[in-house]
């Protein structure tokens, strides 16, 4: 994209000198455990970053090293101790029905080194025009002003907030399911979002659950985000989210736990409610010790849907008692047989 490495330009020396100075000052800091030279370089970058990694592996074994974080189509870096790469990310819902069964293991199992996802997310939402007034300095949200004017010119100016909230809810759902899909993947070493907030440094990239100022937009809050992005996250493998009432809802329950220590004798419970709080099912999934790591099965949840007589949305919540770990999933149930009102039918052309 930007800096061209390996061509003898000043950037080559700079990217060696700066980590040396940084490591001299901060080498023993607990938060300094991984090092890369940068993001998405160009030029003769693979040989250069290979030398970068070799130098640091030989010089300072306190940390682990990678050349650079790169996109999915970029070359592999053979000397890396871990990879930060796109490719094992995203959802496949454009070509198949939504589900939470799948994971990314087929895309990372061929790699011997730990694999960290690159720029997970990038789900976009409609602009929040109320953000324009927050720009009180030299920078102005001129792009938002253009978008607002286009909407006004098309007689939809009053719908801007509704568009933002609707697209934002979908954005939050996509982030939830992509992060959970990552956490369901065994041996996935981690993930990094492109940004938690909107990115204003390169055109318009409304990829954030927060705005440019790291403030909430109104469609998801911190507590809701922590349900699917925390040290301990209950997970559910569900084959689909739309059912008829002659079916049985089934979910296999797992947990991703990267807390400070294993959870001893953890009791996992579930409840299934409608949007008014009526409980249709509840119980215990299981009680067991939960080790540090992911792909830890906890049990399953089954519910016959014959008692659901009208179309409605239900919500399954999974909670690990004695901890902050809780997560939930919506699903929809419809009658299998529908009686159509009889009457005269008129056709016209």
Give residue ranges: language-model regions.
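Carbohydrate-binding surfaces of carbohydrate-active enzymes
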Residues: 138-349
């Amino acid at each position: 994209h930007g800096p061209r490495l390996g061509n003898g330009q000043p950037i080559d020396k700079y990217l060696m000198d700066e980590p040396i100075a940084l490591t001299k000052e901060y080498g023993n800091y607990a938060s300094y455990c991984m090092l890369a030279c940068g993001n998405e370089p160009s030029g003769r970058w693979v040989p250069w970053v290979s030398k970068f990694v070799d130098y640091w592996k030989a010089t300072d074994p306190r940390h682990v090293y990678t050349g650079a974080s790169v996109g999915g189509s970029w070359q592999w870096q053979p000397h890396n101790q871990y990879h930060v790469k796109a490719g094992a990310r995203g959802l496949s819902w454009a070509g198949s029905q939504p589900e939470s069964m799948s994971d990314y293991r087929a895309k990372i199992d061929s790699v011997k080194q730990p694999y960290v996802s690159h720029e997970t997310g990038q789900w976009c939402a409609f602009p929040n025009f109320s953000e324009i007034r927050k720009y009180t300095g030299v920078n102005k949200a001129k792009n938002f002003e253009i978008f607002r004017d286009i909407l006004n010119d098309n007689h939809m100016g009053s719908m801007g907030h509704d568009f933002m909230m609707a697209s934002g809810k979908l954005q939050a759902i996509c982030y939830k399911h992509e992060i959970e899909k990552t956490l369901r993947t065994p041996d996935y070493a981690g993930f990094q979002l492109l940004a938690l907030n909107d990115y204003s440094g390169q055109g318009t990239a409304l990829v954030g659950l927060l705005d440019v100022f790291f403030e909430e937009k109104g469609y998801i809050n911190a507590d809701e985000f922590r349900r699917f992005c925390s040290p301990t996250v209950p997970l559910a493998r569900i084959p689909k989210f739309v059912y008829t009432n002659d079916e049985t809802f089934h979910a296999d329950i797992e947990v991703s736990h990267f807390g400070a220590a294993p959870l001893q004798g953890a009791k996992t419970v579930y409840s299934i409610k409608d949007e008014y709080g009526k409980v249709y099912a509840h119980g215990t999934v299981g009680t067991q010790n939960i080790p540090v790591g992911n792909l830890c099965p906890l049990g399953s949840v089954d519910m016959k849907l014959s008692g659901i007589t009208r179309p409605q949305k239900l919500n399954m919540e999974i909670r690990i008692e004695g901890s902050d770990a809780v997560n939930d999933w919506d699903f929809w149930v419809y009658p299998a047989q529908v009686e159509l009102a009889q009457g005269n039918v008129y056709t016209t052309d």
